[in-house]
């Protein structure tokens, strides 16, 4: 459902296009073209920086929430992030930048990033290429990326061969399944016992 702000934006574009169409009469096509350009520009502006959040939970809770907004402790070894929006040519670089910033912020502590993909309903070739390159770069730096809840784009990544190329052990139905896999691979019981997500590991 569109927010009131989005509805206002659309109304402004619609009214502007209508007024321009009238002003350009009898060359109505000029007003229509400008209206289309305004609509495309608004779409690109809104989707260039989608919501990217790191998730965590209250102690003992299984509900993931925005760690920053709720002042929750974050795990320094395994991070869970959520990205909401389409992943395409206009914002693939933004997603990559946010992932690399997360790694830089946690220095050498971070070993796994679990990406909650439930909020991604579309991905194009640019988005897929970015993900593929990001996986390779992060692996070389000692950080592995896992994906969870991929219902919206799973078929696309299977058809393109992305899943086979990068290994099916990167993909999980639930975030907790990916989390348990990460800690099992790490084999660091001491670090796991100190993680704010420790109650989800066992």
Protein language model regions, located:
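The feature marks cytosolic C-terminal regulatory regions of anion transporters and related permeases
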Residues: 1-165, 183
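Generic detector of well-ordered alpha-helical segments enriched in charged/polar residues
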Residues: 154, 176-179, 183, 198
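Short acidic-hydrophobic, aromatic-tinged amphipathic segments that line or gate anion-handling sites
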Residues: 165-181
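Intrinsically disordered or compositionally simple regulatory linkers and C-terminal tails
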Residues: 186-202
């Amino acid at each position: 459902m569109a927010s009131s702000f989005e509805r206002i934006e659309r109304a402004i574009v619609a009214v502007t296009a209508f007024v321009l169409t009238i002003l350009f009469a009898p060359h109505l096509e000029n007003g229509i073209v400008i209206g289309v350009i305004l609509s495309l520009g608004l779409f690109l502006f809104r989707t260039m920086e989608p919501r990217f959040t790191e998730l965590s939970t209250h102690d003992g809770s299984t509900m993931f929430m925005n760690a920053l907004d709720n002042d929750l402790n974050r795990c320094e070894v395994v991070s869970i992030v959520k990205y909401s929006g389409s992943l395409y040519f206009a914002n693939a670089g933004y997603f990559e930048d946010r992932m690399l910033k997360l790694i830089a912020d946690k220095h050498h502590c971070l070993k796994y990033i679990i990406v909650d993909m439930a909020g991604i309903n579309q991905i194009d070739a640019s988005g897929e290429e970015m993900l593929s390159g990001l996986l390779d770069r992060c692996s070389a730096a000692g950080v592995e990326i896992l994906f969870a809840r991929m219902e919206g784009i799973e078929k696309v990544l299977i058809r393109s061969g992305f899943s086979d190329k990068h290994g099916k052990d990167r993909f999980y139905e639930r975030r907790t399944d990916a989390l348990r896999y990460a800690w099992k691979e790490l084999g660091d019981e001491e670090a796991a016992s100190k993680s704010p997500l420790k109650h989800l590991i066992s």
